[in-house]
Amino acid sequence: MGAMVPRTLLLLLAAALAPAQTRAGPHSLRYFETVVSRPGLGEPRFISVGYVDNTEFVRFDSDAENPRDEPRVRWMEQEGPEYWERETQIAKGNEQSFRVDLRTLLRYYNQSEGGSHTIQRLSGCDVGSDWRLLRGYEQFAYDGCDYIALNEDLKTWTAADMAALITKHKWEQAGAAERDRAYLEGTCVEWLRRYLELGNATLLHTDSPKAHVTHHPRSKVEVTLRCWALGFYPADITLTWQLNGEELTQDMELVETRPAGDGTFQKWASVVVPLGKEQNYTCHVYHEGLPEPLTLRWEPPPSTDSYMVIVAVLGVLGAVAIIGAVVAFVMMMRRNTGGKGGDYTLTPGSQSSEMSLPDCKA
């Protein structure tokens, strides 16, 4: 498996750019690249997608009518033609390398060319509020399974199987780790800073989470309490459950943070508790968009007795209002007839002088 084309980028005026006001961090720049072979349907398809802080900002698709690196957010339209031409050439170079790698891995695994196979790559960097590298990524998977990855020391590789060991030895001889480390510690961090400056208004805002707790019966003696955090940005958030002030790390089920589809994120954490003991458990939500952490409990609905009392009171009040309206109407009619309401009666079959029914005609 050959080394990928390096993402060597020209940092235009990077040193001259004034530091932009940025959120405290951390921040991330990541690229996800995938190639899928499709025997009998033409060349393998290659897709590259770039993310800044979990926001897709660029994309390349070899199946497009005119394959080019394209902006996915409005703020990337500030980049000029030279940038897009350069990034397009990088993507096309990686596309060709991936196609060669597909054929190489077919040999390593002694597979035929008749089936469909996939190579995936994750590369990128995470930085802290001081712009120092927190972690670099250079990871590969084949047919959905780990293949080879650059370790956190950015100096050594971990191979998942015997085939990946062949790639590891080749890359060690070629000094691939040193090249990748230089990119991750330098170029990647600088371009992340650049993208954050371009998308400052969008990327550096915060949306505080809306949180609530739901109640789900499990059995006659247990219930599940689920703490929801919705509509927050950025994606970094912490949810914990506590019992009388002690964290329940081992007993808590926690899902990965998920995109909501509108640029915000959602997450939940649940815990199983004894029925009747729900009020002893509290959910705690930590997010940079909150002035202070949230503490929530499950709020039980009003009891049936309380509900019936409320309905009864509302019924009595409604009846009183109706009676009052009738009395007011009668009093008004008495005033309109000079107080002789007792002499104004209609006997069965009689008609008032002011109202008559039309004749029925055959």
Swiss-Prot record:
Disulfide bonds: 125-188, 227-283
Domain Ig-like C1-type per the UniProt entry, residue ranges: 209-297
Modified residues (Phosphoserine): 353, 356
PROSITE patterns (UniProt xref): IG_LIKE, IG_MHC
Region annotated Connecting peptide, chain positions: 299-306
GO biological process: antigen processing and presentation of endogenous peptide antigen via MHC class I via ER pathway, TAP-dependent; negative regulation of neuron projection development; positive regulation of T cell mediated cytotoxicity; T cell mediated cytotoxicity
Location relative to the cell: Membrane
Alpha-2: region residues: 115-206
Region Alpha-1, annotated ranges: 25-114
Keyword Glycoprotein: yes
TM region positions: 307-333
Glycosylation sites: 110, 200, 280
InterPro entries (UniProt xref): Ig-like_dom, Ig-like_dom_sf, Ig-like_fold, Ig/MHC_CS, Ig_C1-set, MHC_class-I_related, MHC_I-like_Ag-recog, MHC_I-like_Ag-recog_sf
Cytoplasmic side: 334-362
Membrane topology: Single-pass type I membrane protein
Region (Alpha-3): 207-298
Gene Ontology terms: cellular component: external side of plasma membrane; lumenal side of endoplasmic reticulum membrane; MHC class I protein complex; phagocytic vesicle membrane; plasma membrane
Keywords annotated in UniProt: Disulfide bond, Glycoprotein, Hydroxylation, Immunity, Membrane, MHC I, Phosphoprotein, Signal, Transmembrane, Transmembrane helix, Ubl conjugation
Highest taxon, organism lineage: Eukaryota
Primary subcellular site in the record, as a coarse category: membrane
Signal peptide positions (record): 1-24
Similarity comment: family membership: Belongs to the MHC class I family.
Quaternary state and interactors: Heterodimer of an alpha chain and a beta chain (beta-2-microglobulin).
Protein name (record): H-2 class I histocompatibility antigen, D-K alpha chain
Species whose genome carries this gene: Mus musculus (Mouse)
